[in-house]
Amino acid sequence: MAEGSEKVPIARAGPEDVEQGLPPAYTAAVPPPGPGRLLKAGATVLIAGALLLLAGAIGAFYFWKATERQVYNVHYTMSINGKVQDGSMEIDAGNNLETFKTGSGSEEAVEVHDFQIGITGIRFAGGEKCYIKAQPKARVPEVDAMTKASLSSDLEDEIMPVRFDENSLIWVAADEPIKHNGFLSPKILELCGDLPIFWLRPTYPKDKQRERREMKRNKRQSESNFDAEHRAAAAEEVNTRSTPTQLTQDLGPQSNETRPMQQESDQTLNPDNPYNQLEGEGMAFDPMLDHLGVCCIECRRSYTQCQRICEPLLGYYPWPYNYQGCRTACRIIMPCSWWVARIMGVV
């Protein structure tokens, strides 16, 4: 009877099975999966893949829109010593960065302004060093498409003028590189790569230093003369204050008649617009903005500012000079009115 059974035991019941009351295992014929089950599995995989692709497309679209709003590039041309070179400016409002590139190939210079930490990084193509210097901290606001188009048209229509004075400020690298770079941002670390990083210190030629001392001396003298004249004028005003009553009466109606015209002209201008404030001399800019090269106070148009980055000569300072191997890095300088308008979000 056991030989004619269709079920063949493949394992004998062990002691554990006996204790647990489990029957011995038998082989059983498993039917193959039908085509309907395979179709369902394939449809599930296709639907899941389509949903993943749709989610990825939506995420990429929103990421592109956000990046397009916060980062934009402007290309321009400039003439340096009679040679026309290409330049570009990239403003990254999301990371509070500005990047300037000058030249191409072995003559390329890259300058990164990190307004978050207040440090500028400079690197030259083929150079063996990377340079950093301090800069003012600021906040780069987002710029809409209309402002991008107007700024691009202003910079791309003509060759940018270049200001490069041989007797101006010179940046000389320190003798030793920095030992710790933990205070630098990822963008500047990416710019420098594996190169040693050196601080830049400002240096003026000897003739320029003499001129600066003379300017400071003349400024102090002019301020002292102005104070003396101001005191004399104040004393004279006190002595003559009680006499010109008739002149005040004659000028009173005239000033009242012209006052509505003054108010009407003021209403035609937006008092919150920095450009209008500058026209009326109602906005004063810090001279350090111009000195540090952040913007130009007296300019109405942008221009390209070039600076010399030099290596220390390790000689006697300041005669005849203490630097060598100078290279040029250029970037665009905008008017201070445009700069302040950006910070205030007007443009």
UniProtKB/Swiss-Prot annotation:
One GO cellular component term noted in the UniProt record for this chain: endomembrane system
InterPro entries associated with the record: BRICHOS_dom, Chondromodulin/Tenomodulin
Domain BRICHOS: 103-200
GO BP term, pick one: negative regulation of angiogenesis
Keywords recorded for this protein, A-Z: Chondrogenesis, Cleavage on pair of basic residues, Developmental protein, Differentiation, Disulfide bond, Extracellular matrix, Glycoprotein, Membrane, Secreted, Transmembrane, Transmembrane helix
Superkingdom of the organism of origin: Eukaryota
Ranges where the record places region Disordered: 1-29, 208-281
Residue ranges, compositional bias (Polar residues): 240-276
Disulfide bonds: 130-192, 295-299, 296-336, 306-330, 310-326
PTM info: After cleavage, the post-translationally modified ChM-I is secreted as a glycoprotein.
Entry's transmembrane regions: 45-65
Proregion positions: 210-213
Keyword DNA damage applies: no
Expressed in which tissues: Expressed in the cartilage and in fetal precartilaginous tissues as well as in heart and eye.
Glycosylation sites noted in the Swiss-Prot or TrEMBL record: 256
UniProt xrefs under PROSITE patterns: BRICHOS (PS50869)
Record flagged with keyword Transmembrane helix: yes
Function: Bifunctional growth regulator. May contribute to the rapid growth of cartilage and vascular invasion prior to the replacement of cartilage by bone during endochondral bone development. Plays a role as antiangiogenic factor in cardiac valves to suppress neovascularization.
Similarity-based family: Belongs to the chondromodulin-1 family.
Protein name, per record: Leukocyte cell-derived chemotaxin 1
Gene source species: Gallus gallus (Chicken)
Gene: CNMD
